[in-house]
């Protein structure tokens, strides 16, 4: 009875007001963060969106609502933090024109916008695979010609589709020009190198593609360009609405990579009609990724023209 009484007393007591601490976002953001705090109500240049900052909470609690209001001594001084500060101070996007121009000079037509989807297997299901190797089951490829023509190709398969995947990539990616990829080192470039190890007969041709890759994330990761509307994040999903209001991931049946993997895992267990639905949803999602790369890249070009 005493325990029940104490429990009822706790349940009837007013809820404690949530208090922001470093533990809320240390490592990964707490899964209950949105239950406690409404970041949607914060200004785009909120101090809380300052990247890789150990002192932003201290500054915010001291009354610095905007990044431009922070004590300069509290900044760690990274290039991205500088870009965020300048965007907040000037109240417009920050762009290092010369750095962005130098980056853009590397890019040559035709431009191949490339994105993969893959699953990870703790126990290797096929020959030449090691524990926790990945298997690519989907790619999307938009190819932009110098005259502005944009074409799209893709691939989807299940089972041991690695060789078919490689052959399709080699057939469809142009032999010249830039392969523009978002966050390539830990993703598409690494995947092609792994496939080259598994299929040595294709290694040289796959490495030739890797040698032409340029990472679209670099201008954002290194603070060459920053728009406060990014709110401290620079994934493709965050960048797309910054550069275009016409396209969004929100209405897609599959709207993120993990859901694409879950759908792929269920594919073989679905009936024929459901398989068509799954395949279409995965293809549309991956196609959105490469089209987002196209939109973001041209958004950078448009911004440079305005400077």
Task: Please name every model-derived segment.
Residues 62, 114-117, 142-144, 181-183, ...:
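Generic beta-strand/beta-sheet core signal
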Residues 98-175, 197:
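Conserved RNase H-like, two-metal-ion catalytic cores of nucleic-acid enzymes
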Residues 1-45, 239, 243-307:
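Acidic, Mg2+-coordinating catalytic module of metal-dependent nucleases/exonucleases
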Residues 78, 119-123, 148-150, 186-191, ...:
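Flexible loop/turn segments at secondary-structure boundaries
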Residues 42-86:
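Helix-hairpin-helix
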Residues 1-4, 152-258:
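Conserved DEDDh/DEDDy metal-dependent 3′-5′ exonuclease domain
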């Amino acid at each position: 009875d005493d325990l029940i009484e104490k429990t009822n007393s706790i349940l009837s007591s007013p809820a404690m007001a949530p208090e922001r601490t470093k533990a809320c976002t240390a490592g990964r953001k707490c899964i209950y963060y949105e239950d406690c705090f409404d970041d949607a109500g914060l200004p785009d240049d909120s101090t809380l969106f300052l990247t890789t900052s150990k002192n932003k909470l201290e500054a915010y609690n001291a009354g610095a609502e905007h990044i431009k209001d922070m004590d300069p001594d509290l900044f760690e001084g990274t290039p991205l933090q500088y870009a965020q500060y300048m965007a907040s101070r000037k109240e417009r996007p920050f762009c290092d024109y010369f750095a962005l121009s130098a980056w853009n000079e590397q890019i040559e037509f035709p431009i191949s916008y490339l994105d993969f989807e893959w699953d990870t297997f703790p126990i290797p299901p096929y020959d030449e695979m090691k524990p926790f190797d990945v298997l690519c089951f989907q790619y999307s490829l938009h190819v932009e010609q110098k005259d502005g023509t944009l074409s799209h190709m893709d691939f989807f398969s299940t089972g041991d589709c690695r060789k078919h995947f490689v052959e399709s990539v080699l057939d469809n990616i142009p032999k010249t020009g830039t392969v523009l990829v978002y966050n390539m080192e830990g993703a598409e470039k690494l995947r092609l190198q792994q496939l080259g190890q598994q299929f040595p007969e294709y290694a040289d041709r796959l490495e030739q593609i890797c040698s032409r890759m340029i990472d679209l994330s670099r201008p954002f990761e290194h603070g060459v360009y920053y728009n406060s509307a990014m709110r401290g994040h620079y994934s493709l999903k965050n960048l797309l609405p910054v550069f275009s209001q016409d396209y969004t991931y929100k209405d897609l049946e599959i709207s993120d990579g993990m859901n694409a993997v879950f759908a792929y895992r269920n594919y073989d267990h679905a009936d024929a009609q459901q398989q068509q639905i799954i395949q279409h949803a995965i293809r549309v999602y991956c196609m959105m990724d490469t089209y987002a790369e196209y939109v973001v890249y041209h958004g950078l070009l448009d911004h440079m023209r305005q400077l």
